[in-house]
Amino acid sequence: MALDSAKKAQIVAKFARKEGDTGSPEVQIALLTARITELTEHLKIFKKDFSSRLGLLKLVGQRKRLLKYLKNKDYTTYSKLISELGLRDK
């Protein structure tokens, strides 16, 4: 379920604050969203893959924490990011 390096590099390039930025919350959230999307598609096919389902729940929780951090830290970046990724605001 891991992202291939070309797709990962494309996501990092799109959401990075500067060149070589892989640790900013925006990049981390975008990468987690891509992994969550892939795992969701996998689980639509393999409904009884419970270990992958647990991994999906962990990824969703991690993304939720990062989104909460970004919302408190920089709301304008947060709102721009969720609109680009197609996420909902609580």
UniProtKB/Swiss-Prot annotation:
SUPFAM superfamilies: S15/NS1 RNA-binding domain
A Pfam family hit: Ribosomal_S15
Transmembrane parts of this sequence: none
CDD domains: Ribosomal_S15p_S13e
Keywords (A to Z) from UniProt: Ribonucleoprotein, Ribosomal protein, RNA-binding, rRNA-binding
A cellular component annotation (GO) from this entry: cytosolic small ribosomal subunit
GO biological process: translation
GO MF annotation terms: rRNA binding; structural constituent of ribosome
Biological function: One of the primary rRNA binding proteins, it binds directly to 16S rRNA where it helps nucleate assembly of the platform of the 30S subunit by binding and bridging several RNA helices of the 16S rRNA. Forms an intersubunit bridge (bridge B4) with the 23S rRNA of the 50S subunit in the ribosome.
HAMAP family assigned: Ribosomal_uS15_B
Subunit structure: Part of the 30S ribosomal subunit. Forms a bridge to the 50S subunit in the 70S ribosome, contacting the 23S rRNA.
Family: Belongs to the universal ribosomal protein uS15 family.
Name the UniProt record assigns to this protein: Small ribosomal subunit protein uS15
